[in-house]
């Protein structure tokens, strides 16, 4: 046997060793938890045979606490590039079978390498997190590794899409990387995120709480809004990531992939002509409007369990990827509040950063009143949504279906925020406030002296409605470009987006804006 053949056999053996991660027993434990290994997850995510691994043989350099005896090839993270539906992506997956997936200086170097490559090549970076946190034995070097990753998250923001999958624990400083990325997905029952764990919470505050209640997928998908998606199985999670990737571009210099569309752009949807209740205060389901107008009724929702009074997500019109922002009248009448404003603003800014047109479907009676909202800075959060719409230079199309009152009218993509196409249905009520509220302010004194105050106020409400509670007053001043028949909504949106395909709009030169936080 020649030396070259011996070397090749040695290489093959080392590769096999590296692929075992922490060893067969550790892999069995991972499977016993109902979880896949890092390599299995990457294999499910990427096109078959497309994965190109880097730093397979890298080892940590720590000698503290006997760590020199705990060496595993790759040091607990699998990293490299591959394709999803033929499109280049960079990926890293922490390997819980190696030292609990704890982050070392070496692991951070591997993660940073693929992040740098993603920036250089203009391709999305997908991180699969399953880690016990910083490798304590390495001390400050592990913390420095986190900081290196965070800096790259920041530099890559708005340049390439960044997606975080939480498939296990993610605690302490480790949570900041997913928080800095564009989208986060958490596994139900097997993943959690928090800065301080239950034991620390107990020792500091005396509060008894378990991991799931403190930072599980349910908490972060419904209460905090930290995560955008949840999945019950890893297969489902991987498929969600693939679907998400299909709607977004490779980087901020490109557009999202356009797909072939067999759904006619001039398809009339007669059901929309009767979808609004006769009573303007009665709810209806905005999802029915969305699925009626988008290509083939397909809508990929983002943060579906958080701030349900506003709906955001991706769809297509004539094969073109768009971001949908819509008020939901069946949840709190579609009012805007702190969480809805945060959710909407973040999504609008992502779409603008990555050249995805924004279609807004408006039915909003105002902002939610109350001390709870004011104490939680609804002013600042509402201003975030206003800022996001006003800053966005992508094509913007707004359709007002029914109510659009006061400040909420402005922040939901009004004409003065440089929205390109503003349409309204005939039922639209575009005004400072609703008729009853306006009349209560305008005629309070006169009503007291009226022979029949109720009849007097009813008459004045009707007068106000006739004057303001319609789309024609706004159309008269050019704030609405056209009043359209509801069943024509899909066609008008498609045609509007086609007109705006070559839109170019520049902002004043600046280092960056100071968005209210």
Model region roles, listed by residue range:
Residues 1-517:
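Ligand-binding clefts of soluble mixed alpha/beta catalytic domains
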């Amino acid at each position: 046997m020649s030396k070259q053949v011996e070397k090749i056999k040695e290489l093959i053996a080392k590769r096999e060793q590296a692929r075992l991660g922490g060893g067969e027993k550790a892999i069995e434990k991972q499977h016993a938890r109902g979880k896949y290994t890092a390599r299995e997850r990457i294999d499910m995510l990427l096109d078959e045979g497309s994965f190109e691994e880097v730093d397979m043989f890298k080892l940590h350099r720590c000698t503290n606490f006997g760590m020199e005896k705990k060496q595993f090839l790759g040091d607990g993270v699998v990293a490299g590039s591959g394709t999803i539906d033929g499109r280049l992506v960079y990926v890293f997956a922490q390997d819980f079978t190696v030292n609990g997936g704890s982050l070392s200086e070496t692991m951070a170097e591997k993660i940073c390498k693929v992040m740098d490559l993603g920036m250089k090549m203009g391709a999305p970076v997908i991180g699969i997190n399953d880690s016990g946190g910083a490798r304590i034995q390495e001390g400050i070097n592990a913390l420095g590794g986190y900081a290196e990753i965070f800096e790259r998250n920041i530099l890559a923001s708005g340049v390439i899409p960044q997606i975080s999958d939480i498939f296990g624990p993610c605690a302490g400083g480790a949570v900041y990387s997913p928080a800095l990325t564009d989208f986060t997905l958490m596994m139900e029952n097997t993943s959690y995120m928090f800065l301080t764990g239950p034991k620390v919470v107990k020792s500091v505050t005396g509060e008894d709480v378990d991991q799931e209640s403190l930072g599980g997928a349910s908490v972060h998908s419904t209460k905090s809004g930290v995560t955008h998606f949840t999945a019950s199985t890893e297969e489902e999670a991987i498929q969600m990531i693939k679907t998400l990737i299909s709607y977004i571009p490779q980087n901020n210099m490109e557009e999202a992939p356009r797909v072939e569309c067999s759904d006619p752009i001039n398809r009339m949807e007669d059901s929309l002509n009767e979808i609004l209740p006769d009573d303007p205060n009665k709810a209806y389901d905005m999802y029915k409007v969305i699925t009626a107008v988008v290509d083939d009724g397909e809508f990929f929702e983002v943060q579906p369990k958080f701030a349900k009074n506003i709906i955001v997500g991706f769809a297509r019109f004539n094969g073109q990827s768009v971001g949908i922002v819509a008020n939901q009248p069946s949840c709190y009448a579609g009012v805007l509040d702190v969480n809805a404003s945060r959710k909407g603003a973040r999504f609008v800014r992502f779409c603008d950063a990555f050249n995805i047109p924004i279609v807004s479907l408006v039915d909003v009676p105002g902002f939610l009143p109350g001390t709870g909202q004011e104490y939680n800075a609804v002013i600042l959060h509402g201003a975030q949504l206003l800022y996001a719409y006003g800053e966005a230079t992508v094509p913007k199309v707004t359709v007002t279906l029914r109510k659009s009152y006061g400040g909420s009218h402005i922040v939901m993509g009004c004409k003065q925020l440089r929205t390109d196409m503003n349409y309204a249905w005939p039922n639209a009520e575009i005004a400072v406030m609703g008729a009853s509220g306006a009349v209560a302010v305008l005629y309070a004194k006169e009503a007291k002296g009226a022979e029949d105050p109720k009849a007097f106020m009813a008459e004045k409400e009707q007068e106000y409605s006739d004057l303001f509670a319609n789309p024609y007053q706004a159309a008269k001043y050019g704030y609405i470009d056209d009043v359209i028949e509801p069943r024509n909504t899909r066609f008008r949106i498609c045609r509007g987006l086609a007109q705006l395909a070559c839109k170019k709009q520049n902002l004043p030169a600046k280092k960056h804006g100071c968005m209210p936080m």
